[in-house]
Protein backbone atom coordinates (compact mmCIF):
# COMPACT_ATOMS: atom_id res chain seq x y z
CA UNK A 1 0.00 0.00 0.00
CA UNK A 2 2.98 2.29 0.53
CA UNK A 3 3.75 2.25 -3.20
CA UNK A 4 0.15 3.13 -4.01
CA UNK A 5 0.19 6.01 -1.53
CA UNK A 6 3.44 7.30 -3.03
CA UNK A 7 1.94 7.39 -6.51
CA UNK A 8 -1.21 8.94 -5.09
CA UNK A 9 0.81 11.86 -3.75
CA UNK A 10 2.38 12.31 -7.20
CA UNK A 11 -0.84 12.18 -9.21
CA UNK A 12 -3.43 13.93 -7.07
CA UNK A 13 -2.35 17.36 -8.32
CA UNK A 14 -3.52 16.12 -11.74
CA UNK A 15 -6.92 15.30 -10.22
CA UNK A 16 -6.20 11.57 -10.13
CA UNK A 17 -7.54 10.44 -6.78
CA UNK A 18 -7.85 6.66 -7.03
CA UNK A 19 -5.03 4.18 -7.49
CA UNK A 20 -5.01 0.41 -7.10
CA UNK A 21 -2.62 -2.51 -7.52
CA UNK A 22 -3.06 -6.23 -8.10
CA UNK A 23 0.02 -8.48 -8.08
CA UNK A 24 -0.20 -12.10 -9.22
CA UNK A 25 2.41 -14.87 -9.26
CA UNK A 26 1.92 -16.10 -12.81
CA UNK A 27 3.51 -19.47 -12.06
CA UNK A 28 1.07 -20.37 -9.29
CA UNK A 29 -1.90 -18.09 -9.93
CA UNK A 30 -1.71 -16.74 -6.39
CA UNK A 31 -2.65 -13.14 -5.65
CA UNK A 32 0.32 -11.66 -3.81
CA UNK A 33 -1.08 -8.18 -3.25
CA UNK A 34 -4.52 -6.61 -3.57
CA UNK A 35 -4.63 -2.90 -2.78
CA UNK A 36 -8.02 -1.53 -3.75
CA UNK A 37 -7.38 2.18 -3.22
CA UNK A 38 -4.98 4.74 -1.81
CA UNK A 39 -5.24 4.97 1.97
CA UNK A 40 -5.22 8.76 2.12
CA UNK A 41 -7.95 9.32 -0.49
CA UNK A 42 -10.77 11.40 0.97
CA UNK A 43 -14.29 10.03 1.36
CA UNK A 44 -15.48 12.46 -1.31
CA UNK A 45 -13.34 10.55 -3.81
CA UNK A 46 -14.45 7.09 -2.75
CA UNK A 47 -11.61 6.16 -0.43
CA UNK A 48 -13.43 3.06 0.82
CA UNK A 49 -14.24 1.76 -2.67
CA UNK A 50 -12.21 -1.17 -3.99
CA UNK A 51 -11.64 -0.03 -7.57
CA UNK A 52 -9.98 -3.27 -8.71
CA UNK A 53 -13.25 -4.94 -9.83
CA UNK A 54 -14.76 -1.65 -11.07
CA UNK A 55 -15.16 -1.33 -14.87
CA UNK A 56 -13.19 1.63 -16.23
CA UNK A 57 -11.62 2.69 -19.50
CA UNK A 58 -8.46 0.63 -20.03
CA UNK A 59 -6.68 3.11 -22.28
CA UNK A 60 -4.02 1.33 -24.35
CA UNK A 61 -3.86 -1.90 -22.34
CA UNK A 62 -5.39 -4.04 -25.09
CA UNK A 63 -2.72 -3.15 -27.66
CA UNK A 64 -0.36 -6.02 -26.71
CA UNK A 65 -3.24 -8.49 -27.00
CA UNK A 66 -4.11 -7.16 -30.46
CA UNK A 67 -0.45 -7.47 -31.42
CA UNK A 68 -0.40 -11.12 -30.28
CA UNK A 69 -3.64 -11.82 -32.10
CA UNK A 70 -2.18 -10.35 -35.30
CA UNK A 71 0.97 -12.47 -35.01
CA UNK A 72 -1.09 -15.58 -34.44
CA UNK A 73 -3.21 -14.93 -37.52
CA UNK A 74 -0.18 -14.22 -39.68
CA UNK A 75 -1.34 -10.68 -40.36
CA UNK A 76 2.04 -9.24 -39.43
CA UNK A 77 5.50 -10.02 -38.12
CA UNK A 78 7.54 -7.71 -35.83
CA UNK A 79 9.19 -6.00 -38.79
CA UNK A 80 5.99 -5.49 -40.79
CA UNK A 81 5.22 -1.89 -41.67
CA UNK A 82 2.04 -0.23 -40.44
CA UNK A 83 0.65 3.12 -41.62
CA UNK A 84 0.84 6.14 -39.35
CA UNK A 85 -0.81 9.10 -41.03
CA UNK A 86 -4.01 11.14 -40.54
CA UNK A 87 -7.06 9.05 -41.38
CA UNK A 88 -10.80 9.16 -40.91
CA UNK A 89 -12.58 5.91 -40.14
CA UNK A 90 -16.23 6.70 -40.66
CA UNK A 91 -16.06 9.83 -38.52
CA UNK A 92 -13.43 8.47 -36.11
CA UNK A 93 -10.09 10.26 -36.52
CA UNK A 94 -7.54 8.87 -34.04
CA UNK A 95 -4.41 10.77 -33.09
CA UNK A 96 -1.19 9.72 -31.43
CA UNK A 97 -0.41 10.99 -27.95
CA UNK A 98 2.25 13.38 -29.29
CA UNK A 99 -0.13 14.53 -32.09
CA UNK A 100 2.53 13.64 -34.66
CA UNK A 101 2.66 11.12 -37.50
CA UNK A 102 5.61 9.11 -38.80
CA UNK A 103 4.14 7.97 -42.11
CA UNK A 104 5.00 4.30 -41.59
CA UNK A 105 6.27 2.45 -38.50
CA UNK A 106 7.56 -1.11 -37.89
CA UNK A 107 5.00 -3.17 -36.00
CA UNK A 108 7.25 -3.80 -33.01
CA UNK A 109 7.79 -0.05 -32.59
CA UNK A 110 4.04 0.54 -32.74
CA UNK A 111 3.78 -1.61 -29.63
CA UNK A 112 6.85 -0.20 -27.88
CA UNK A 113 5.72 3.39 -28.47
CA UNK A 114 2.03 2.61 -27.93
CA UNK A 115 1.04 4.46 -31.09
CA UNK A 116 -2.68 4.96 -31.54
CA UNK A 117 -3.11 5.47 -35.27
CA UNK A 118 -1.23 2.33 -36.44
CA UNK A 119 -3.07 0.33 -33.77
CA UNK A 120 -6.40 1.41 -35.24
CA UNK A 121 -5.21 0.41 -38.72
CA UNK A 122 -4.18 -2.96 -37.28
CA UNK A 123 -7.54 -3.53 -35.61
CA UNK A 124 -9.18 -2.74 -38.95
CA UNK A 125 -7.12 -5.54 -40.51
CA UNK A 126 -7.86 -8.04 -37.75
CA UNK A 127 -11.53 -7.07 -37.59
CA UNK A 128 -13.30 -5.76 -34.53
CA UNK A 129 -15.71 -8.75 -34.30
CA UNK A 130 -12.84 -11.26 -34.36
CA UNK A 131 -10.81 -9.32 -31.80
CA UNK A 132 -13.82 -8.86 -29.56
CA UNK A 133 -14.47 -12.59 -29.60
CA UNK A 134 -10.85 -13.23 -28.64
CA UNK A 135 -11.17 -10.85 -25.69
CA UNK A 136 -14.26 -12.66 -24.49
CA UNK A 137 -12.44 -15.98 -24.72
CA UNK A 138 -9.70 -14.49 -22.56
CA UNK A 139 -12.25 -13.94 -19.81
CA UNK A 140 -13.37 -10.35 -20.35
CA UNK A 141 -17.04 -10.03 -19.40
CA UNK A 142 -17.67 -6.30 -19.67
CA UNK A 143 -17.70 -6.28 -23.48
CA UNK A 144 -21.38 -7.10 -23.72
CA UNK A 145 -22.26 -5.03 -26.80
CA UNK A 146 -21.83 -6.07 -30.45
CA UNK A 147 -18.70 -5.06 -32.33
CA UNK A 148 -20.57 -2.29 -34.15
CA UNK A 149 -21.20 -0.59 -30.81
CA UNK A 150 -17.48 -0.24 -30.05
CA UNK A 151 -16.03 0.16 -33.52
CA UNK A 152 -12.32 0.76 -33.93
CA UNK A 153 -12.17 2.83 -30.73
CA UNK A 154 -12.15 -0.51 -28.89
CA UNK A 155 -8.36 -0.56 -29.10
CA UNK A 156 -8.00 2.93 -27.58
CA UNK A 157 -10.07 2.49 -24.43
CA UNK A 158 -13.43 2.87 -26.11
CA UNK A 159 -15.03 0.41 -23.69
CA UNK A 160 -14.57 -0.59 -20.05
CA UNK A 161 -12.87 -3.41 -18.21
CA UNK A 162 -11.66 -4.04 -14.67
CA UNK A 163 -8.13 -4.27 -13.33
CA UNK A 164 -9.02 -7.78 -12.14
CA UNK A 165 -9.85 -9.01 -15.64
CA UNK A 166 -6.93 -7.20 -17.28
CA UNK A 167 -4.44 -8.62 -14.79
CA UNK A 168 -5.92 -12.08 -15.20
CA UNK A 169 -5.63 -11.95 -18.98
CA UNK A 170 -2.00 -10.83 -18.89
CA UNK A 171 -1.09 -13.33 -16.16
CA UNK A 172 -2.79 -16.13 -18.05
CA UNK A 173 -0.83 -15.41 -21.21
CA UNK A 174 2.43 -15.18 -19.24
CA UNK A 175 1.71 -18.49 -17.54
CA UNK A 176 1.09 -20.09 -20.91
CA UNK A 177 4.62 -19.13 -21.95
CA UNK A 178 6.19 -20.26 -18.66
CA UNK A 179 4.35 -23.56 -18.33
CA UNK A 180 2.79 -24.56 -21.67
CA UNK A 181 2.15 -28.14 -20.52
CA UNK A 182 -0.09 -27.16 -17.59
CA UNK A 183 -3.76 -27.93 -18.04
CA UNK A 184 -5.13 -26.19 -14.94
CA UNK A 185 -4.39 -22.68 -13.77
CA UNK A 186 -6.53 -20.60 -11.47
CA UNK A 187 -6.02 -17.26 -9.78
CA UNK A 188 -6.67 -17.46 -6.05
CA UNK A 189 -5.60 -15.80 -2.84
CA UNK A 190 -2.75 -17.02 -0.63
CA UNK A 191 -3.93 -19.49 1.99
CA UNK A 192 -6.67 -20.75 -0.31
CA UNK A 193 -8.95 -17.81 0.37
CA UNK A 194 -11.39 -17.22 -2.46
CA UNK A 195 -11.38 -13.96 -4.33
CA UNK A 196 -14.17 -11.56 -5.02
CA UNK A 197 -17.05 -12.52 -7.26
CA UNK A 198 -14.81 -11.70 -10.22
CA UNK A 199 -12.13 -14.29 -9.33
CA UNK A 200 -13.71 -17.07 -11.33
CA UNK A 201 -13.30 -14.99 -14.49
CA UNK A 202 -9.58 -15.68 -14.43
CA UNK A 203 -9.82 -19.47 -14.24
CA UNK A 204 -7.61 -21.06 -16.90
CA UNK A 205 -7.87 -17.97 -19.09
CA UNK A 206 -4.72 -18.95 -20.90
CA UNK A 207 -6.26 -22.26 -21.94
CA UNK A 208 -9.02 -20.50 -23.86
CA UNK A 209 -6.92 -17.69 -25.28
CA UNK A 210 -5.76 -19.54 -28.38
CA UNK A 211 -2.28 -18.00 -28.13
CA UNK A 212 0.62 -20.42 -28.36
CA UNK A 213 4.24 -20.15 -27.24
Q: Predicted regions: what is each one?
A:
Residues 20-23, 32-34, 81-83, 109, ...:
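Structural recognition of the beta-strand scaffold that forms the well-ordered cores
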Residues 24-28, 54-59, 102-103, 107, ...:
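Secondary-structure capping and boundary motifs in well-ordered enzyme cores
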